[in-house]
């Protein structure tokens, strides 16, 4: 798939099981992207709504998820201004890492407001966090906001420190950093599985 990142559906299921309240039923994803989390949530009967800036991604995901037990819906919108219509019991998102991937619509171009087309990291961060602000407003009390994120590097090879800024952002808004999960994909730890590959001369 051209090295595009794909969210692991098993990780989606684990996150739902760990962080959805016992009687929770609604999930909001402010940066929708691919179908995986919505499909898993809908399969288990949860209500899932996502803000997604690309019409082609919305159409593809909505077609895949139209017959699930729970409604899963991607809405063409800008996350920095979109407000969910109902309170939610879990916010999950896996937003873009700055300047790592390209997100295009039907016309082969990034839609206006697409995060990775924003010229500076600071503008990217502020737009990303504006989307988080809207999601926090929709989140019920004593519920989790789960972000799967990573860092990227500037032209000098230095980290932007986006992960650290995430933690400060949420703490400044009264949320608590409850847990950190390091996610290792099997593809990148394959060498450790095959004993002979570790025998060097």
List the model feature ranges, each with a label:
Residues 61-62:
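Conserved SAM-binding loop
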Residues 142-150:
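Conserved beta-strand signature within the Rossmann-like core of class I S-adenosyl-L-methionine
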Residues 127-134, 138, 165, 169:
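Short, conserved SAM-binding segment of the class I
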Residues 6-44, 50-51, 79-80, 86-106, ...:
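Conserved proline-anchored active-site loop of SAM-dependent methyltransferases
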Residues 88-134, 153-156, 160:
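Mobile active-site "lid"/loop adjacent to the S-adenosyl-L-methionine
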Residues 54:
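Conserved SAM/SAH-binding beta-strand->alpha-helix loop
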Residues 153-201:
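Class I S-adenosyl-L-methionine
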Residues 67-79:
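Conserved SAM-binding strand-loop segment of SAM-dependent methyltransferases
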């Amino acid at each position: 798939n051209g090295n595009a990142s794909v969210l692991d559906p098993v990780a989606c299921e684990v996150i739902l099981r760990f962080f959805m309240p016992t009687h929770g039923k609604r999930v909001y994803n402010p940066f929708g992207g691919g179908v995986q989390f919505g499909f898993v949530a809908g399969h288990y009967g949860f209500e899932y709504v996502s803000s997604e800036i690309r019409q082609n991604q919305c159409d593809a995901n909505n077609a895949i998820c139209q017959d699930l037990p729970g409604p899963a819906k991607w809405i063409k919108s800008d996350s920095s201004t979109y407000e969910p219509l109902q309170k939610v019991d879990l916010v999950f998102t896996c937003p873009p890492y700055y300047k790592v991937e390209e997100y295009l619509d039907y016309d082969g171009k990034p839609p206006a407001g697409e995060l990775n087309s924003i010229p500076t990291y600071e503008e990217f961060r502020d737009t990303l966090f504006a989307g988080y602000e809207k999601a926090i407003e929709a989140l019920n009390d004593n519920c989790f906001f789960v972000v799967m994120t990573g860092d990227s590097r500037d032209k000098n090879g230095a980290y932007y420190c986006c992960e650290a800024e995430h933690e400060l952002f949420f703490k400044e808004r009264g949320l608590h950093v409850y847990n950190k999960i390091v996610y290792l994909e099997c593809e990148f730890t394959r060498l450790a599985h095959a004993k002979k590959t570790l025998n060097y001369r």
